């Protein structure tokens, strides 16, 4: 995975440079859509088939996305370059890195909140506001439910993890008691 990240980084940075001159949100949407299409095993199979030309693969990818930028010359060049260099499997990683660059520019970060129970509107808003004060940046939450936590939440922002779950506390007590 680290290798994919290393190979994808220059593509993401170059694409972000192009996006900065225009509409970053629109480019973000395009990259996310392309990544979603590139994840499909059928698309990867077609892309690797010797019976299908590279131009046809590029056209297939661009036809599959809804973004108005799909007709942009730079977007077409990106897709053609990835197809020509057999780099379609990189698109999901390029999308991840593009989002990281976008978030860094906005002073924001993605946060994964794993809770033992579903979080409702006001409860989620309060938690996110509290986390934004702690991490000193705007957070874009994604919420998952994992009943094995028993109670509490586990929050992941980048490479930082804040685990206040009952399961983590029990594990900590077990370690303390057996030491």
Curated annotation (Swiss-Prot):
SUPFAM superfamilies according to UniProt: N-terminal domain of the delta subunit of the F1F0-ATP synthase
Protein name as catalogued: ATP synthase subunit delta
Keyword Thylakoid: no
Any one Pfam family match given in the protein's UniProt record, by short name: OSCP
Membrane topology: Peripheral membrane protein
Molecular function GO terms recorded: proton-transporting ATP synthase activity, rotational mechanism
Organism field: Paraburkholderia xenovorans (strain LB400)
GO CC, any one term: proton-transporting ATP synthase complex
Predominant subcellular localization, coarse grouping: membrane
InterPro entries associated with the record: ATP_synth_OSCP/delta_N_sf, ATPase_OSCP/dsu
Similarity annotation: Belongs to the ATPase delta chain family.
Known function: F(1)F(0) ATP synthase produces ATP from ADP in the presence of a proton or sodium gradient. F-type ATPases consist of two structural domains, F(1) containing the extramembraneous catalytic core and F(0) containing the membrane proton channel, linked together by a central stalk and a peripheral stalk. During catalysis, ATP synthesis in the catalytic domain of F(1) is coupled via a rotary mechanism of the central stalk subunits to proton translocation.
GN (gene name): atpH
Localization (cell): Cell inner membrane
Assembly, per entry: F-type ATPases have 2 components, F(1) - the catalytic core - and F(0) - the membrane proton channel. F(1) has five subunits: alpha(3), beta(3), gamma(1), delta(1), epsilon(1). F(0) has three main subunits: a(1), b(2) and c(10-14). The alpha and beta chains form an alternating ring which encloses part of the gamma chain. F(1) is attached to F(0) by a central stalk formed by the gamma and epsilon chains, while a peripheral stalk is formed by the delta and b chains.
Alphabetical UniProt keywords: ATP synthesis, Cell inner membrane, Cell membrane, CF(1), Hydrogen ion transport, Ion transport, Membrane, Transport
